C-alpha cells in the first residue's frame, strides 16, 4: 500500500455522516497527546495531513483519508483532557463507540499509547471493545525515541503484563514506534498492509 497517496476526504461529527460502508477502513484511536496526528503524518510522509495540535483533544471529528481502491484511514477524536464540557465528551465517546460497533468496513484499530505513561481506562476500553467485536488491534507504543533501551524493555514488559489481564487473542499485537526517528515505521506498514489485503 502506498500510504503517501493519502488524501483528506472529510470530517464527520456523526457516524451517520460517513461515506458508504464499503471497502476497508483502519481507525486510529488514542488519548490526547498520544502522538496520533504525528503517527499519521509519518505513515503518509505528509507533514500536514493530520493537524498536529498544541492543544490536546482538538480532534473533535471523525476524519477520513482516502488511500485509493476504496481503502481509508480514519482518525478518531482524541480522548482525554480536551477543554470541552462533559456532555460533549460523552457525545464524542458515544459516536466513537457507534463507529467501532456499527462500521462493517472497519478491519482494524491502531491504538496509540505514549509509552512514557501507564495505560489508562480509555486504553482498556479500546482493547475490550476490539476483543468484543473481534477486531484486529495493533498498539503503537509512541515516543519510543524519548526512552533508553532499558526503559523500552520495561515498557514492553508493562504492555505484556497488561494484555495478560484480557482474553487471549491473536488479533492483538503491539510495537515500539517513534514519529520523530521513524523507528518501527516499516514494521507498522507491514502490519497495516495485511489489514488492507
UniProtKB/Swiss-Prot annotation:
Protein name per the record: Probable GTP-binding protein EngB
Domain EngB-type G positions: 22-197
Pfam families reported for this sequence: MMR_HSR1
PANTHER family: ENGB-TYPE G DOMAIN-CONTAINING PROTEIN, MSS1/TRME-RELATED GTP-BINDING PROTEIN
Cofactor(s) listed: Mg(2+)
GO molecular function: GTP binding; metal ion binding
Function according to Swiss-Prot or TrEMBL: Necessary for normal cell division and for the maintenance of normal septation.
One GO BP: division septum assembly
Source species, domain of life: Bacteria
PROSITE patterns: G_ENGB
NCBIfam families reported in the protein's UniProt record: GTPase_YsxC
A GO cellular-component term linked to this record: cytosol
InterPro entries from the UniProt entry: G_ENGB_dom, GTP-bd, GTP-bd_ribosome_bio_YsxC, P-loop_NTPase
HAMAP family referenced in this protein's UniProt entry, alphabetically: GTPase_EngB (MF_00321)
Native source organism of the sequence: Francisella tularensis subsp. tularensis (strain SCHU S4 / Schu 4)
Chain sites annotated for binding Mg(2+): 37, 59
Chain sites annotated for binding GTP: 30-37, 57-61, 75-78, 142-145, 177-179
Alphabetic keyword roster: Cell cycle, Cell division, GTP-binding, Magnesium, Metal-binding, Nucleotide-binding, Septation
Family, as annotated: Belongs to the TRAFAC class TrmE-Era-EngA-EngB-Septin-like GTPase superfamily. EngB GTPase family.
Keyword Cell cycle: yes
Amino acid at each position: 500500500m502506498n500510504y503517501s497517496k493519502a488524501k483528506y476526504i472529510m470530517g464527520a461529527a456523526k457516524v451517520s455522516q460517513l461515506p458508504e460502508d464499503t471497502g476497508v477502513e483502519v481507525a486510529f484511536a488514542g488519548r490526547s497527546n498520544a502522538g496520533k496526528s504525528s503517527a499519521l503524518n509519518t505513515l503518509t510522509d505528509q507533514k500536514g495531513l493530520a493537524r498536529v495540535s498544541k492543544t490536546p483533544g482538538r480532534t473533535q471529528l471523525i476524519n477520513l483519508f482516502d488511500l485509493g481502491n476504496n481503502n481509508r484511514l480514519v482518525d478518531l477524536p482524541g480522548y482525554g483532557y480536551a477543554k470541552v464540557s462533559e456532555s460533549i465528551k460523552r457525545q464524542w465517546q458515544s459516536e466513537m463507540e457507534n463507529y467501532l460497533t456499527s462500521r462493517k468496513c472497519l478491519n482494524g484499530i491502531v491504538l496509540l499509547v505514549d509509552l512514557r505513561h501507564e495505560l489508562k481506562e480509555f486504553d482498556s476500553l479500546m482493547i475490550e471493545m476490539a476483543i468484543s467485536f473481534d477486531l484486529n488491534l495493533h498498539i503503537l507504543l509512541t515516543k519510543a525515541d524519548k526512552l533508553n533501551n532499558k526503559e523500552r524493555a520495561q515498557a514492553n514488559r508493562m504492555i505484556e503484563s497488561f494484555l495478560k489481564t484480557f482474553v487471549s487473542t491473536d488479533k492483538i499485537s503491539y510495537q515500539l514506534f517513534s514519529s520523530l526517528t521513524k523507528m518501527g515505521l516499516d514494521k507498522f506498514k507491514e502490519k497495516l498492509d495485511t489489514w488492507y489485503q
